[in-house]
Amino acid sequence: MLRYLSLFAVGLATGYAWGWIDGLAASLTV
C-alpha cells in the first residue's frame, strides 16, 4: 500500500514539475 502511495506521489510530482517546466518554456518563447 505504502509503495503505491509513494509511486503515486513521485508520479504526481514529476507531472507537476514537467508542467511547470513546459509553462516556463512556453512563456520564454513568447
Curated annotation (Swiss-Prot):
<protein>
    <recommendedName>
        <fullName>3.2 kDa protein</fullName>
    </recommendedName>
</protein>
